[in-house]
Amino acid sequence: KNGALVSNHSYGFLGGFEYGNYSGFSAWHWFGEDEDTEYVGFGHYGDTDSAWDLISYNAPYFLPIKAAGNPRGDGPKEGDTHYVQVKEDGKEVWVKSTKVRQKNGGEFGYDCINTGSVGKNILVVAAANKILDGYEKPEDVVAASFSAFGPTDDGRIKPDITGIGVDV
């Protein structure tokens, strides 16, 4: 067999804080359980990850390439209003909340790669800033402020590789 097959999957699932109009209001929205203060999907090896690994196992010359995601540091200021989905009369509705929740990636920016991008047999790509004056030393390579970092909940290091992802 010659070469490898690759596929690009530069999308992911909503998790933790996302800014948008999901409730009908442009604001921060919490994509987690109301009682949670930290999003449990970050770093979690879920059904989608298992499916990617099964595909990779059954197609050994195929490499799925996934985006690490861009949620790092996202979230409102502590105590600011955001929206969260709760069940009312058997249906999901968006309600205002001022509950203090951890920004995506917490204080240090780690553990914010969402489920669906933590498979064991996929290549996960993070974003880095451009190096404007040429590479001279490792410190010249700087991850984009928004790009997701691991580790996964089972201790694996993700992302696997970083490429230029700012002002491309």
Give the residues covered by each predicted segment.
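Loop-rich non-cytosolic ectodomains and luminal regions
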Residues: 1-168
